[in-house]
Amino acid sequence: MTSNNSNQPITYPIFTVRWLSVHALGVPSVFFLGAIAAMQFIQR
């Protein structure tokens, strides 16, 4: 995180496979945890 242009290739932003994997796993997991936590309170 010190120098952004030292060990990365020429046109390769951080907005790629790593970003997609983090959000493809993080966003649904947070959604499902919220849904499961909400289900705990609506038991008849």
From Swiss-Prot:
It comes from the Bacteria. This b-type cytochrome is tightly associated with the reaction center of photosystem II (PSII). PSII is a light-driven water:plastoquinone oxidoreductase that uses light energy to abstract electrons from H(2)O, generating O(2) and a proton gradient subsequently used for ATP formation. It consists of a core antenna complex that captures photons, and an electron transfer chain that converts photonic excitation into a charge separation. This is Cytochrome b559 subunit beta. The gene is psbF. Heterodimer of an alpha subunit and a beta subunit. PSII is composed of 1 copy each of membrane proteins PsbA, PsbB, PsbC, PsbD, PsbE, PsbF, PsbH, PsbI, PsbJ, PsbK, PsbL, PsbM, PsbT, PsbX, PsbY, PsbZ, Psb30/Ycf12, peripheral proteins PsbO, CyanoQ (PsbQ), PsbU, PsbV and a large number of cofactors. It forms dimeric complexes. It comes from Synechococcus elongatus (strain ATCC 33912 / PCC 7942 / FACHB-805) (Anacystis nidulans R2). The chain crosses the membrane at residues 19-35. NCBIfam families: cyt_b559_beta (TIGR01333). SUPFAM superfamilies: Cytochrome b559 subunits. GO terms for molecular function: electron transfer activity; heme binding; iron ion binding.
